[in-house]
């Protein structure tokens, strides 16, 4: 006899982070690093990083160096990102692999990060809308209006303002352990009223909050092990 059992399961979703032109650079770097590296295989680690083009040299170049050399993350990027790091490769640093169109639609759940430079918040929102569904959306900004617009317009299960995507979880919200993150918008049975036609989007406002333990560079761990030996 065949029995059918209903199940509740996690579905595919991409997590994005956007770094605005008005931002606290050290805090934003920590948020991005924590969002990707704290547990790279997790569903709420970021897959795509969008950076406002004006922040390429003051923010992005140093961040990519850290991702490649300190944390051993594979970085793939848009042509502008590849060009930026191509100049760095000439000085002895590792290079960035060009991203394909398919890469912007991938949920990696691995130590891989796709990076794209965007002109402004408009382009960032358009990219996220065109490469979904979006599981977690992070914005790093010091601009209140940009934070509010991003939170309002991005279609994601959760928006983290100046906080790590890794905090998008039951225990991150103080609700206790969860079994997954759901992207479905309609889960109702029986009479359908206004309440059944609405769904929730979590918005968390932070000031650089991270999920602990915060990642330690592999080079630092290697040095500690050598010292102990």
Predicted regions and their residues:
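Conserved C-terminal structural/oligomerization subdomain of aldehyde/semialdehyde dehydrogenase
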Residues: 97-229
């Amino acid at each position: 006899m065949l029995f059918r059992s209903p199940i509740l399961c996690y579905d595919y979703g991409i997590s994005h982070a956007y770094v605005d032109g008005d931002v606290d650079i050290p805090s934003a770097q920590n948020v991005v690093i924590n969002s990707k590296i704290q547990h790279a295989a997790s569903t709420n680690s970021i897959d795509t990083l969008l950076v406002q083009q004006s922040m390429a040299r003051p923010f992005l170049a140093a961040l990519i160096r850290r991702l490649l050399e300190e944390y051993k993350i594979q970085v793939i990027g848009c042509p502008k990102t590849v060009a930026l790091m191509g100049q760095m490769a000439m000085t002895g640093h590792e290079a960035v692999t060009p991203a394909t169109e398919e890469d912007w639609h991938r949920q990696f759940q691995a130590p891989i990060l796709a990076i794209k430079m965007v002109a402004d918040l408009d382009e960032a929102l358009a990219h996220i809308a065109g490469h979904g569904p979006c599981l977690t959306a992070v914005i790093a900004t010091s601009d209140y209006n940009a934070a509010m617009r991003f939170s309002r317009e991005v279609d994601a299960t959760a928006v983290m303002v100046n906080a790590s995507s890794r905090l998008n979880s039951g225990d991150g919200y103080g609700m206790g352990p969860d079994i997954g993150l759901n992207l479905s918008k309609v889960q109702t049975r029986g009479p359908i009223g206004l309440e059944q036609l609405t769904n929730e989007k979590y918005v968390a406002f932070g000031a650089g909050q991270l999920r602990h333990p915060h990642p330690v560079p592999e080079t630092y761990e290697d040095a500690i092990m050598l010292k102990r030996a």
